[in-house]
Amino acid sequence: MIFLLPPVIFVMLLAESVLILGDSEDADLMEMVQMSRPFFNPIIPAVEFVDLREERQRACGHLHDPCPNDRPGHRTCCIGLQCRYGSCLVQVGR
């Protein structure tokens, strides 16, 4: 288990150094770093994560909302919906 610790620490340091580089900060990378911190620092209150989840749910597109696909890999539709034909639609097979 101890041999896994150095690669994990290296990844965390690499992610933080990317954030320090400057103006090219990516919101998804920043969120990844924020979400991975509780694993190393359990003192952070859970209230912040509830607020983050509520903010993410408000920011997502609901049924028939437009969903521009200008950021590949970024989910613009709420959970259970997919971006099809420029709108948030129900997933195929449901």
UniProtKB/Swiss-Prot annotation:
Keywords: Disulfide bond, Ion channel impairing toxin, Knottin, Secreted, Signal, Toxin. The keyword Nucleotide-binding does not apply. Disulfide bonds join C60-C78, C67-C83, C77-C88. Residues 23-58 form a propeptide. Expressed by the venom gland. It is found in: Secreted. Coiled coil: none annotated. Belongs to the neurotoxin 14 (magi-1) family. OAIP-1 subfamily. This is U27-theraphotoxin-Cg1a. It comes from Chilobrachys guangxiensis (Chinese earth tiger tarantula).
